[in-house]
């Protein structure tokens, strides 16, 4: 019988244990998180990269407009595919809350964020604030010999016939915010009458709210109705645009981060939401050319945004705008 010397046996056991340990580590599933995100692709990608670097997690991100996100999450009610919805406006978040599709979670790091930017029940936390503005192509204005629109009524002028572009309220949070702003500024009867008068001047209703930026930038249309961050981002990139705001006051939105009901990765979702409310995360927005006002008081405001921090804003009724019945009624009437 061959005898195995004790030393060799011990070394063999140590090697086997080390090998088993390494295999066990390799066998452990990697941390994963699936998100639906509203910001433009470069900004969403920068946020994903920032969190992956911090957490060593693997993130899967799908960029969706507000309407697309609401419709997709509703369709996935019985089999949720994503854990976090990020950067979609408050009316859409309130619609999802009313539908029972959000999971409350209060990030500890959100304690410093003002209460007006948070749901008291913890269903959503605001990340950044933005408002509706007008983006005008400078070449178009010069050739026409006109000034950029300064009021809602200016958009109905004949010189803007077929020259306006905005997102469809059926699929775009920007478009929905625009219409709900008009209805609140003018009242519903006068607001719908105004929208009917405006329609002949609209060349295109785009699927996404950011769609008009390229059309205005290339001079395919003269004016786009957009959130300010999209306009300022395009100006920053060198597009020949200028931004103006309606003197009557403009609508605004609070872009939020939420956990979805039945989130398949709840712990990673909580980690991401904790990070999303920090100054570090919010400053990535401007660093990736997404120019909004951050909700965290310690987050730096980009120089391009500072001149518009005191914009005249309407007293926007988010409870009304975010009500699913309101949304359905507005979208149905708009489409008909």
Short names for language-model regions:
Residues 91-95, 217, 222-240, 289:
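A ligand-binding cleft/hinge motif common to bilobed small-molecule-binding domains
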Residues 135-140, 179-180, 253-265, 284-285:
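A bilobed periplasmic-binding-protein/Venus flytrap-type ligand-binding module shared by bacterial periplasmic
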Residues 38, 42-45, 81-220:
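Extracytoplasmic ligand-binding site segments that recognize negatively charged/polar headgroups
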Residues 1-17:
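N-terminal secretory signal peptides and thylakoid transit peptides that target proteins
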Residues 28-94:
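Early extracytoplasmic/lumenal segment of secretory-pathway proteins
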Residues 316-336:
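Conserved C-terminal helix/tail region of periplasmic/extracytoplasmic solute-binding proteins
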Residues 260-318:
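Mature extracytoplasmic/periplasmic domains
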Residues 194-199, 205-206, 237-263, 297:
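Periplasmic-binding protein-like
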């Amino acid at each position: 019988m061959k005898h195995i010397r004790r030393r060799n046996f011990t070394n063999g056991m140590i090697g086997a244990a080390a090998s088993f340990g390494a295999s066990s580590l390799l066998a452990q599933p990697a941390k994963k998180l699936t998100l639906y995100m509203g910001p433009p692709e470069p900004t969403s990608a920068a946020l994903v990269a920032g969190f992956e670097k911090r957490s060593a997690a693997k993130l899967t991100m799908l960029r969706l407009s507000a309407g697309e996100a609401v419709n997709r999450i509703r369709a996935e009610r019985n089999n949720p595919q994503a854990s976090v919805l990020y950067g979609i406006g408050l009316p859409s978040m309130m619609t999802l809350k009313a539908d029972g599709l959000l999971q409350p979670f209060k990030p500890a790091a959100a304690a410093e964020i003002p209460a007006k930017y948070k749901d008291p029940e913890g269903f959503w936390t605001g990340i950044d604030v933005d408002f509706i503005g007008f983006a005008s192509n400078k070449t178009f204005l010069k050739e026409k010999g006109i000034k950029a629109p300064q009021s809602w009524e200016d958009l109905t002028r004949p010189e803007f016939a077929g020259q306006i572009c905005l997102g469809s309220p059926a699929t775009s949070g920007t478009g929905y915010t625009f219409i709900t702003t008009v209805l609140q500024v003018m009242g519903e009867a006068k607001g719908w009458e105004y929208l009917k008068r405006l329609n002949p001047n609209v060349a295109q209703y785009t699927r996404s709210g950011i769609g008009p930026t390229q059309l205005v930038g290339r001079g395919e249309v003269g004016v786009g109705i957009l959130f300010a961050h999209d306009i300022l981002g395009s100006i920053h990139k060198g597009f020949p645009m200028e931004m103006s705001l309606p003197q009557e006051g403009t609508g605004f939105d609070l872009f939020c981060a939420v956990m979805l009901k039945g989130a398949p990765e709840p712990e990673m979702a909580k980690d991401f939401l904790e990070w999303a409310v920090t100054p570090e995360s919010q400053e990535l927005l401007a660093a990736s050319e997404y120019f909004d006002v951050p909700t965290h008081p310690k987050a730096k405001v980009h120089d391009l945004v500072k001149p518009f921090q005191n914009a005249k804003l309407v007293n926007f009724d988010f409870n009304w705008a975010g009500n699913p019945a309101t949304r359905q009624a507005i979208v149905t009437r708009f489409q008909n």
